[in-house]
Structure formats: structure tokens, C-alpha cells
A protein has these predicted regions:
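Acidic/charged, solvent-exposed loop-and-adjacent secondary-structure segments enriched in E/D, K/R, S/T
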Residues: 78-105
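N-terminal mature ectodomain segment of secretory-pathway/periplasmic proteins
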Residues: 16, 21-74
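Anionic-ligand binding region
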Residues: 101-117
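Gly/Pro-enriched, hydrophobic low-complexity segments
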Residues: 112-198
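Beta-turn initiation residues at beta-strand->coil junctions
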Residues: 61-62, 81, 156-159
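Solvent-exposed strand-loop boundary residues in beta-sheet-rich modules
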Residues: 39, 82-84, 161
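Boundary at the C-terminal end of the N-terminal hydrophobic targeting segment
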Residues: 3-5, 10
């Protein structure tokens, strides 16, 4: 039996989520990432995310200032200003690892990607918990905090090493217009470019 059959209300909400993001052509939202591992203090970063289908993303960080992640549809570029280094990796090698935030690219299909899906009220929102169907992914559990109109406010990812990454989103705008140049990465003068090794 599908996990969806057990909770019709949650299933309906998740279909609303899928339609919201899968139908949008572009997206702009403020984001905050918080990474926690073991007994260490959480590490937080924040900024603005701009996205346009197919496969274009720009994560422009205000904290740490100057950090930039750009996906041009083929490669993912990450600039770390404190090291003046650019990491470049093919998109196909990075997309699976970030499957819990695949909704940003309009590729979220809960029933296909997740199992043991449950939903419970949290204030006026719904907290949806799930596990990946594939055992080959670097995370063991994910939680989505979803508003009544299908907007994802938070995504909590528990990785296999028990580290936790929480993405929070605010001031979401659907279908804004963007200049093409936002999604073309230009290597800063003097920066070292490190390319991921191909398997």
C-alpha cells in the first residue's frame, strides 16, 4: 500500500506542493542554512536564492559576504572568497545529494522519491517527515514544514553521519523575471579553479 493511502489529507497537501513548484518557471526567496554536527555549535549562512528553469540557480550569500553558488544548467560553481577558490562540479554529480531541495528545480515527487511519509500539524503548518526510497543517498531522513497553501518554509535533512542541515525560506516570489547573466558564472580575477574529479 502506498504511504499516501494512509493519510489522504497529507497526500493532498503534498500534491499542492508539487504543483506549486513544478509549475513555476522561476523563483526568488530569502534563505538560511544551518549546519549542525555532533556537539559542535551550529554554523549558519544566509542570503538570496534566484532560480529559473531548467536547472539555473544562483545562491548569493550575505553571510558570509561574497560567497556565491551558481548553477548554469551544466555545472555547479561555488566561490569561496576567504580562500579565493572556485569549486566546479558537473550538475549530474551534485543533484542527487541535494534531492531534498529538488523542489527548487521543480523536480519534487514525494511518492517517487520517499517512503514512510507522515504528516502532523505544527501550528497552522504541517510537518511532513519522510525517508528516501534509495539507500544510495547521503541522507537518512528529511522533514518539510509546509504551509496550508503548499509553500515550503523549512527543510531539515539528517545525513548518514547524523549531521543535520536545515534550510529555511522566506519572502518567496513565484515567476519573477531574471537577467540571463545572473546564471553565468565569471571566475573572479586570480581565483583558483578546482574541478571535481570525474568518476
Amino acid at each position: 500500500m502506498s504511504a499516501f493511502a494512509a493519510d489522504v489529507q497529507t497526500a493532498g497537501l503534498l500534491k499542492t506542493v508539487e504543483q506549486r513548484y513544478n509549475r513555476a518557471d522561476s523563483l526568488q526567496v530569502l534563505f538560511r542554512e544551518e549546519y549542525t554536527r555532533g556537539g559542535h555549535a551550529p554554523r549558519a549562512e544566509s542570503g538570496t536564492l534566484e532560480l529559473r528553469k531548467p536547472g539555473r540557480m544562483r545562491w548569493e550569500y550575505s553571510d558570509p559576504k561574497g560567497k556565491l553558488v551558481v548553477c548554469d544548467g551544466k555545472n555547479l560553481w561555488m566561490y569561496i572568497p576567504s580562500e579565493n577558490r572556485v569549486d566546479k562540479s558537473p550538475l549530474k554529480e551534485t543533484d542527487e545529494a541535494e534531492a531534498p531541495i529538488a523542489f527548487l528545480l521543480g523536480k519534487l515527487h514525494f511518492e517517487k522519491e520517499f517512503r514512510n511519509i507522515t504528516g502532523k500539524p505544527e501550528g497552522s503548518d504541517t510537518l511532513v517527515a519522510a525517508e528516501p526510497k534509495s539507500d544510495n543517498l547521503p541522507y537518512s531522513a528529511v522533514e518539510f514544514l509546509v504551509t496550508a497553501d503548499g509553500r515550503i518554509r523549512n527543510v531539515k535533512v539528517t545525513r548518514l553521519d547524523n549531521s543535520i542541515m536545515v534550510y529555511s525560506f522566506d519572502q518567496e516570489k513565484l515567476n519573477p523575471r531574471f537577467d540571463d547573466k545572473l546564471f553565468h558564472f565569471q571566475v573572479p580575477t586570480g581565483a583558483e579553479v578546482v574541478e571535481a574529479e570525474k568518476n
